[in-house]
């Protein structure tokens, strides 16, 4: 069910990150050398999840693996125990909660009309549902983390914190961000561009779907303008 996927991606997955933040507070702040393997492991896990996204043919699986990759960044930021790292981790959890929930919502919008989640069978939707294509573009751009979204603020904080803590981590971070941009654009092009394979009549997007997407995208834009609400 789509509601379960949205709640799982937006809330339950983030509770794990919140639990790690609470647990890290009772541990002693140690030297860089001790935590470096765990940070590298978290970032390597994020890269592997991103690469898994690139080879997915199922839309829902792709979005689920993208959540896993973003949580890798969150874990890496929490482990270093710096104020910027914690602020970035909290912001990214909130931002990705909105983004992944919006992506699951859009995937369901597509599924209700095509009855399939296979990427190659859902192409050409820009001809059928142009407004939905706009939402797809906006949400994928948020997933890539472009300004002025919350995702950009959070990834900037995490990147700065990790680079100051250990400059070598920028290699893994940069690779992760590059692959994130690749699979996000791949997802958008696969579902929206190209010739449509649908022959049956498709109903237009409803007002409730536009309202749902507005309520996901608006906080992402607004909170980045006033970040003290969450930091």
Curated annotation (Swiss-Prot):
Which InterPro entries does this one have? Answer: NADH_UbQ_OxRdtase, ND/Mrp_TM
How does the entry describe its membrane topology?
Answer: Multi-pass membrane protein
Reaction(s) catalysed by this chain's protein: a ubiquinone + NADH + 5 H(+)(in) = a ubiquinol + NAD(+) + 4 H(+)(out)
Q: For this UniProt entry, which residues form the secretion signal?
A: none
This entry's Enzyme Commission designation comes to 7.1.1.2
GO terms (molecular function) for this protein are: NADH dehydrogenase (ubiquinone) activity; ubiquinone binding
* GO terms classed as biological process: ATP synthesis coupled electron transport; electron transport coupled proton transport
Pfam family membership, one: Proton_antipo_M
Q: Name one GO cellular component term.
A: mitochondrial membrane
- Identify which top EC class this enzyme belongs to: translocase
| Protein location | Mitochondrion membrane
Report the superkingdom from the record.
Eukaryota
The main place the protein resides is mitochondrion
Q: Which UniProt keywords apply?
A: Electron transport, Membrane, Mitochondrion, NAD, Respiratory chain, Translocase, Transmembrane, Transmembrane helix, Transport, Ubiquinone
List where the protein spans the membrane: 1-21, 34-54, 61-80, 85-107, 128-148, 169-189
User: What's its job?
Assistant: Core subunit of the mitochondrial membrane respiratory chain NADH dehydrogenase (Complex I) that is believed to belong to the minimal assembly required for catalysis. Complex I functions in the transfer of electrons from NADH to the respiratory chain. The immediate electron acceptor for the enzyme is believed to be ubiquinone.
Assigned protein family: Belongs to the complex I subunit 4 family.
Q: What is this protein called?
A: NADH-ubiquinone oxidoreductase chain 4
Per the UniProt record, the source organism is Gloydius blomhoffii (Mamushi)
Its gene is MT-ND4
